[in-house]
From Swiss-Prot:
Protein name, per record: DNA protection during starvation protein 1
Native organism: Deinococcus radiodurans (strain ATCC 13939 / DSM 20539 / JCM 16871 / CCUG 27074 / LMG 4051 / NBRC 15346 / NCIMB 9279 / VKM B-1422 / R1)
Domain notes: 12 di-nuclear ferroxidase centers are located at the interfaces between subunits related by 2-fold symmetry axes.
SUPFAM superfamilies cross-referenced by the UniProt entry: Ferritin-like
Assigned GO CC terms: cytoplasm; nucleoid
Miscellaneous comment as given in the Swiss-Prot or TrEMBL entry: Dodecameric dps forms large aggregates upon binding to DNA.
Region Disordered, residue ranges: 1-31
UniProt entry keywords in alphabetical sequence: Cytoplasm, DNA-binding, Iron, Iron storage, Metal-binding, Oxidoreductase
Gene Ontology process terms (BP): intracellular iron ion homeostasis
Length: 207
């Protein structure tokens, strides 16, 4: 009769096989390890490669995807905050416009995160990660004034649009035309929203 393995023996075999005992990502809650590492010693990650990218190319592309993911989430939150904060004669116009702009950029959040996963990475989106990677800052204070809001958003959108164009070129040079093409599309959307807000800001009644 074959002797059944004990739990301790099973655990020993698990350790020898390299499969972690601490969950699918192999990290303990609150531990020092980060779930963003593409090469954690887990069964799942052992099956993941960077598709057609070399390691250096992947690092370049992954860096842009993580930064742009954090930036887009922050931009979404900023539009929402200003949507709630706005007061005055332009309340209804901007209150509704901000939600329309959010609807245009929101899909790119999931698209960028899933693109990173498809290439063998793991997106970070905790509050601390947003603060670390995002190029857009969400104000902690209440901002009621329409011109202050719009001018701030125009400045952010100008920077984000340029970032997408720069990152598109970087990804193209890193042998990833797919991500580069994604960024070109996002840049066009950001440019359109910036143009619309700039047109609103040019209205003298905004003061």
């Amino acid at each position: 009769m074959t002797k059944k393995s004990t739990k301790s023996e099973a655990a020993s075999k698990t350790k020898k096989s390299g499969v972690p005992e601490t969950g699918a990502q192999g990290v303990r809650a609150g531990g020092a390890d980060h779930a963003d590492a593409a090469h954690l010693g887990t069964v799942n990650n052992a099956l993941v490669n960077h598709h057609y990218l070399e390691e250096k190319e992947f690092q370049t592309v992954a860096e842009t995807l993580q930064r742009n993911l954090a930036t887009t989430i922050s931009l979404y939150l900023k539009f929402k905050k200003y949507h709630w904060d706005i007061r005055g004669r332009f309340f209804r116009d901007l209150h509704l416009a901000y939600d329309e702009f959010i609807a245009e950029i929101f899909p790119s959040i999931d698209e960028q995160a899933e693109r990173l996963v498809a290439l063998g990475g793991s997106p970070l989106a905790a509050p601390a990660d947003l603060a670390r990677y995002s190029t857009v800052q969400v104000p902690q204070e209440t901002v009621r004034d329409a011109r202050t809001q719009v001018a701030d958003l125009v400045q952010d959108l100008s920077r984000v649009g340029k970032g997408y164009r720069d990152d598109s070129q970087a990804c193209d040079e890193a042998n990833d035309p797919v991500t580069a093409d994604m960024y070109n599309g996002y840049a066009a959307t950001i440019d359109k929203i910036r143009w619309m807000l700039q047109a609103i800001m040019d209205d003298e009644r905004l003061d």
